């Protein structure tokens, strides 16, 4: 299985250490083992290669943007099974990641994974986003919901000149969402990304 991870990362030109491969391998195995108990991902994608390509590789597509912005801390909203927060934290270990997940089941899983993978740069926040008072330079969210459902709430958690990075799907669905929230932000940028293994992905960057 580690060889599959190494191949996938190499195909997408991601830099990695062997310890990163070991952590990803264990992480995927834990999701497969505990998915039914914690309701982590769709059953239709609950096999090793689907998790690797649709979730792990997809999560990593945002890492270059994070490194370019170079924030000291990142808030990942609605972390669920840990995508993208856990994946980013594994490959970006010098940065602090706060994973906010309101579901007790999923946050329990995240706490288990944090300990098992020894992710000292991760902190799990188990509550509704409205309770969060800290301000962040950078926020990530990977959600199927329309951006107008969460844009204002997330903007209020940004420091001045902060940035929200929203993982979104097909480009033709994004324009309507962007038009609904364009007056909230000083600048909105759409980055079209692709890899040989993941589905179509666009990053929507919302600047305060």
From Swiss-Prot:
Places the protein is found: Cytoplasm
Report residues binding S-adenosyl-L-methionine: 78, 83, 101-103, 129-130, 142
Question: What Enzyme Commission number(s) appear in the record?
Answer: 2.1.1.-
Extract the Pfam families matched here.
Answer: GidB
Q: Name one GO molecular function term.
A: rRNA (guanine-N7-)-methyltransferase activity
Q: Which Gene3D superfamilies match?
A: Vaccinia Virus protein VP39
Single GO cellular component term: cytosol
Keyword terms of this UniProt record: Cytoplasm, Methyltransferase, rRNA processing, S-adenosyl-L-methionine, Transferase
Please state which protein family the record places this protein in.
Belongs to the methyltransferase superfamily. RNA methyltransferase RsmG family.
* Physiological role: Specifically methylates the N7 position of a guanine in 16S rRNA.
Its name, as the record gives it, is Ribosomal RNA small subunit methyltransferase G
| Name of the gene | rsmG
